A protein has these predicted regions:
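Eukaryotic intrinsically disordered and solvent-exposed regulatory patches
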Residues: 58-60, 79, 90
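Histidine/acidic-residue-rich catalytic or RNA/ligand-binding cores of hydrolases
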Residues: 23-25, 83-90
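Binuclear metal-dependent phosphoesterase catalytic core
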Residues: 88-131
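Short beta-strand scaffold segments in enzyme catalytic cores
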Residues: 2-6, 82-84, 100-107
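Active-site environment of divalent metal-dependent phosphoester hydrolases
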Residues: 19-21, 72-84, 99-101
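Hydrophobic/aromatic beta-strand patches that form the interior of the parallel beta-sheet core
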Residues: 12, 73, 91-93
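Active-site-proximal loop/helix segment associated with metal-binding centers of metalloenzymes
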Residues: 1-67
Length: 131
């Protein structure tokens, strides 16, 4: 299973990103290499990509530049309203609870987190007819 998927236009979807304090130990090339057992350990870069919750704008900007990302779309954190745009280039969403959302994204033109979050659709508002 991949750690992340990235569109040519700059949307990266991943479970999480490393905590900011772990950046000195984080291998930014983790997405370009074959993972080895050390990457999965609690001090490994693959692990950091799954369990991080504390981010800063400076950190996000650095990773965005390194990876060619315009917008990070993350899960992992509990978001009571279903979606949150805490940083200009990172949003968090949940689809696994009563206020969960889905997010249509125009991959031809990636917008900032606030605009993109405004396009979220509450799962509870979607009607599915089963015949």
């Amino acid at each position: 299973m991949p750690l992340a998927v990235k569109s040519e236009s700059g949307l990266m979807c991943c479970h999480s990103l490393p905590n900011e304090v772990m950046m000195p130990e984080f291998n930014e090339h983790i997405l370009d290499k074959v993972l080895d057992p050390q990457d999965y350990r609690s001090d490994g870069s693959a692990y950091f990509m799954v369990w991080g919750r504390q981010h800063t704008q400076e950190q996000l900007d650095k990773l965005a530049k390194s990876w060619g990302v315009k917008l990070f779309c993350l899960g992992h954190a509990w978001v009571p309203g279903g979606i949150r745009a805490e940083f200009k280039n990172m949003l968090q969403l949940n689809s696994d609870h009563a206020k969960g959302v889905v997010l249509p994204v125009n991959l031809e033109k990636i917008q900032d987190a606030t605009y993109t979050a405004s396009m979220a659709i509450k799962l509870g508002s979607i009607r599915i007819d089963v015949t």
